[in-house]
Amino acid sequence: MNGNEFGRLFRMTTYGESHGEAMGCTVSGVPAGVELSEEEIQKDLDRRKPGQSMITTSRGEPDKVTINSGIQDGYTTGTPIGMVIQNKDARSGKYEPFITAPRPSHGDYTYSAKFGTRNWGGGGRSSARETVNWVAAGGVAKQVLEQSDYDVQIKAHVCQIGDVEAGPVTFEDMLEHSEENEVRCADPEAAEEMRDVADQHQKEGDSIGGAIYFECRGVPSGLGAPRFDSFPSRLGQAMYSIPAVNDFEYGIGREARTTKGSEYTENWEFDEDGHPTPVGNDHGGIQGGITTGQPIYGEVSWHAPVSIPKTQETVDWETGEGKEITVTGRHDPVLPPRAVPVVEAMLACTVLDFMLLGGRINPDRLDGRPGEYDTDYHPSSPQNDPEDADTHAKTIDDD
């Protein structure tokens, strides 16, 4: 199975199934000298983990991360970083009825059609549980960005559940208020209504869709490449890879379809530092597929979860007959509240990858951070002076 990697220089490779022993990922391309905190990664994993509230799945996973390679004395060494998260509450028995009877609108049939087999416990690799790896990798990316010379800030919040939409909020509102309620919406009044909508659908044995607004500040201009490596095309790949996502837009998004060119065009002016900057930001910080230096923003939308305890019609390919099934596992009635850290993680991974590719961050080690050894060439040093070679060799032997 291909497609388990994301990124070019900052590269995440993941493994694990929903009801297997563990989830895990390897992150390569992290510069040496980054002070990496397992606790900071855990904070984001705690925001994503199940069982947080009555509107999330009741699966009891602590999602504790263990870093098992790539760091020494709290700092990255430049080698691949390995992270493992154990599955503690897997219950595959409830999925046995679906071994030969695919659940509607899941990956059960399509995985079987492609590979001739599949891990049927909880959907295996197709489960959204796999995003726990993405959040762990994103936690690494965030720390690299925070310790770089750029003040990159990333934040997201739930902007819609069902028909309830949040009012306008600022970046500061998201930083201060999005974690104050279980919906993760920075608009407190809308959050209460969203909570009621999710709760009502859950009581009815149903589910509902929603959307997340994201914003990234501090990204320099010049990231991205024309055409197939443009910033939005790579960011779109990241967001569409998230399970159940069915729409991604940046800038004013779909509003651009009804906006006149004279209104959508952004003129240029000099900012207070004398740098060219667009007037306005309907383009979401991107022009010609390359970043302008303005905030990058947009929305990601989810369809309603399709694992619901209502009777559904399917077929049994073993008996060749139709069959009624009920999905009785533990599932979320709405996805965006737990997906906020997933969106932030994939945005962080994308931004860091582009900054490494563009040379904005040293891919070997963070600039300005002293290494353990001085690697500069000094002609007068013993190892480069033939007359001192014997003395130097004796010193090594004595050690």
Swiss-Prot record:
Disulfide bonds: none annotated. CDD domains: Chorismate_synthase. Pathway: Metabolic intermediate biosynthesis; chorismate biosynthesis; chorismate from D-erythrose 4-phosphate and phosphoenolpyruvate: step 7/7. Residues 41-72, 363-399 are annotated as: Disordered. One of its GO terms (molecular function) is FMN binding. GO terms for biological process: amino acid biosynthetic process; aromatic amino acid family biosynthetic process; chorismate biosynthetic process. It catalyses: 5-O-(1-carboxyvinyl)-3-phosphoshikimate = chorismate + phosphate. It comes from the Archaea. Residues 363-377, 389-399 have a biased composition (Basic and acidic residues). GO terms for cellular component: cytosol. InterPro entries: Chorismate_synth, Chorismate_synth_AroC_sf, Chorismate_synthase_CS. This reaction introduces a second double bond into the aromatic ring system. Belongs to the chorismate synthase family. HAMAP family: Chorismate_synth. This is Chorismate synthase.
